[in-house]
Amino acid sequence: MMDESADIKPVPTSEDVAAPSGTEPVAPAPKKKRARTSTKAIMAAIEQRLGHTFADISLLTTAFTHVSALKSSRGRCDSYQRLEFLGDHVLGLVVSDMLYRAFPKADEGELSKRLADLVRKETCIDVAKSLDLQEGVKLGAVGAGAGARLRRSVLGDICEAVIGAVYLDGGYAAAAAFVERNWLERMRKPVRPLRDPKTVLQEWAQGKGLPTPVYREVERTGPHHDPRFRVAVELPGLESSEGIGGSKRAAEKAAASAMIVREGVK
């Protein structure tokens, strides 16, 4: 039997092949580095999602700049804070107009409840997430925090700042169009109960002949600029309930809500 392995010759490598006479050896091509997405490309993508092309792109850039990204306190006016202030009021005006036209039979109390629900921070955070606005946020070392974690509150602020930027760039009509695109479906949803859960729990306890609920801080975690609180609420004869929040007040509300749900408080 013929040894087939004798006919198999090794494939020459680049080191085995001599360069033709009179030519320099060809150096291997350098490895390509993965290109980072430029700020300009990110802003262009965000413009598309917003549905507004900025004549002054610096307004959009400022709307995404957290104060921690600035080198000195003198540059605070270059952060999104002023635009957030403006956008907050523009949002309130546009949503008020939308509610007035959408619910002609609603009284002032119902309109106020619906307005409060639609302009609250959590709603702005939801809108920001739906538009992937976190992609454009500019944070400094302090703002980024441990693990470059983006605080939820920053997203809500930026959403309002974007509204302010659109208003300055395109006027009321442009800002109103943006708000209507992103708030219309939310406006059509049933309004949530807006009463403070701590008040609801206290009134329920009093009706049962119980003392005022006691709130106790159980734990505080996280860095100084982004703390997380765990609070327990206690009532005699009932199992305590706990809540977590970015402030003691928020954690207390969460704890009260947990007890309200568990006890079936209406």
UniProtKB/Swiss-Prot annotation:
Annotated binding of Mg(2+), by residue: E84, D157, E160
Main location: cytoplasm
RNA-binding in keyword set: yes
SMART domains: DSRM, RIBOc
GO CC list: cytoplasm
Record's keyword annotation contains Transmembrane: no
Domain called DRBM: residue spans: 196-265
Pfam families tied to this protein: dsrm, Ribonucleas_3_3
Top-rank lineage group of the source organism: Bacteria
GO molecular function terms noted in the UniProt entry: double-stranded RNA binding; metal ion binding; ribonuclease III activity; rRNA binding
Residue ranges of the region described as Disordered: 1-35
Annotated EC: 3.1.26.3
Catalytic reactions of this protein: Endonucleolytic cleavage to 5'-phosphomonoester
PANTHER family given in the database record: RIBONUCLEASE 3, RIBONUCLEASE III
HAMAP family: RNase_III (MF_00104)
Similarity section: Belongs to the ribonuclease III family.
Assembly mode: Homodimer.
Function, in words: Digests double-stranded RNA. Involved in the processing of primary rRNA transcript to yield the immediate precursors to the large and small rRNAs (23S and 16S). Processes some mRNAs, and tRNAs when they are encoded in the rRNA operon. Processes pre-crRNA and tracrRNA of type II CRISPR loci if present in the organism.
Name by which UniProt lists this protein: Ribonuclease 3
Species the sequence originates in: Nitrobacter winogradskyi (strain ATCC 25391 / DSM 10237 / CIP 104748 / NCIMB 11846 / Nb-255)
